[in-house]
């Protein structure tokens, strides 16, 4: 350990495969060439935005597994999260895989958190393979946190826009790298109310 928040891994896990899937708007931006799959239909052929988000996670995981030349059955653990109640996008994405699942709830932090926890699990010798995943969908986030699109409210040009995308990383306990050598966990600084 380096100080209180940073962990140095004794056996740094190797990134064996990674993939990302995004929606149309993200594909129109300056990072277009960095994406593995850009879908022109934000429903991803599904009947709801929540199902679309789950479909993105499935696609990202399968692409990452393909790059790692592994099957889902080789995974010892999946660490995944999204912004929906009870992590339903993640839960339904990995349903039927037969892999132990840690559901994480958070926004952008979920990707770093899932990578950190998966790395700790592998470095600790509790498995050989793990996946770290995160997703969000603009439309499902609007419904849950802001103004549901069905409401028809007007958005200002400077309003937040949650990404429609999913990312997955397959980690191996041993491999040719790149490696996750360290992880730093943030502090929450709260001041106790003095009475």
Regions found by a protein language model. Name each.
Residues 1-48, 148-191:
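Condensing-enzyme catalytic core mediating Claisen C-C bond formation in acyl metabolism
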Residues 15, 49-109:
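Conserved beta-ketoacyl condensing-enzyme motif
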Residues 31-34, 90-100, 122-123, 145-154:
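A glycine- and small-aliphatic-rich helix-loop capping segment at beta-alpha/alpha-beta transitions
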Residues 1-2, 62-67, 115-119, 154:
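Short alpha-helical segments and helix-capping/turn motifs at coil-helix boundaries
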Residues 86-88, 138-143, 187-191:
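Short, well-ordered, mixed-charge alpha-helical segments that flank or form enzyme active sites
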Residues 80-81, 130-136:
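Short beta-strand segments
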Residues 104-132, 171:
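Active-site-proximal alpha-helical scaffold in enzymes
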Residues 71-75, 124-133, 178:
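Short secondary-structure capping/junction motifs at helix and strand boundaries
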């Amino acid at each position: 350990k380096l100080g209180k928040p940073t962990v140095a891994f004794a056996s740094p896990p190797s990134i064996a495969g990674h993939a990302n899937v995004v929606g149309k708007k993200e594909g129109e931006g300056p990072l277009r060439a960095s994406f593995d799959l850009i879908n022109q239909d934000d429903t991803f052929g599904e009947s709801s935005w929540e199902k679309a988000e789950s479909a993105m996670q499935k696609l990202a995981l399968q692409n990452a597994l393909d790059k790692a030349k592994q099957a889902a059955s080789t995974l010892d653990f999946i660490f995944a999260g999204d912004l929906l109640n009870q992590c339903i996008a993640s839960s339904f994405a990995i349903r039927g895989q037969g892999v132990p699942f840690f559901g994480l709830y958070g926004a952008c932090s979920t990707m770093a958190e899932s990578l950190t926890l998966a790395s700790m699990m592998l470095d600790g010798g509790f498995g050989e393979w793990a996946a770290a995943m995160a997703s969000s969908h603009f439309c499902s986030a609007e419904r849950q946190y802001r103004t549901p699109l069905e409401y028809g409210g007007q958005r200002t040009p400077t309003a937040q826009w949650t990404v429609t995308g999913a990312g997955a990383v397959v980690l191996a306990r041993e491999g040719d790298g790149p490696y996750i050598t360290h992880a730093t966990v943030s502090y929450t600084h709260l001041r106790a109310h003095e009475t």
